[in-house]
């Protein structure tokens, strides 16, 4: 390989890594949602917390801003799980498209 080909390969690799990082940041920001007057981040941590509280219908949890919020556990779990799945599926579709361009 000549130097021009090596430089082109390095730039393409850098662009791919940067695009993946931007994609991750984009979907991490989309994981945020509002519910019951609080801001929440959909993800395994929230879902595990809600599963631990499953025996109670209403609990008080701290949202992203450390504000105590009374929530209905089944409602918040359903919303968090649905939001998580929607965003992860969309992220996977975009990730697969980017991987094909490489």
Which residues does each predicted region cover?
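A preference for well-ordered globular domain cores
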Residues: 1-102
């Amino acid at each position: 390989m000549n130097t021009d080909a090596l430089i082109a390969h390095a730039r393409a690799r850098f662009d791919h890594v940067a695009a993946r990082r931007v994609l991750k940041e984009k979907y991490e920001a989309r994981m945020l949602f509002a519910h019951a007057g609080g801001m929440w981040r959909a993800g395994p941590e929230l879902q595990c917390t809600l599963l631990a509280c499953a025996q109670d219908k209403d609990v008080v949890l701290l949202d992203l801003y450390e504000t105590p919020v009374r929530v209905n556990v089944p409602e918040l779990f359903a919303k968090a799980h649905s939001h998580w799945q929607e965003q992860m599926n969309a992220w996977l579709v975009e990730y697969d498209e980017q991987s094909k361009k490489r």
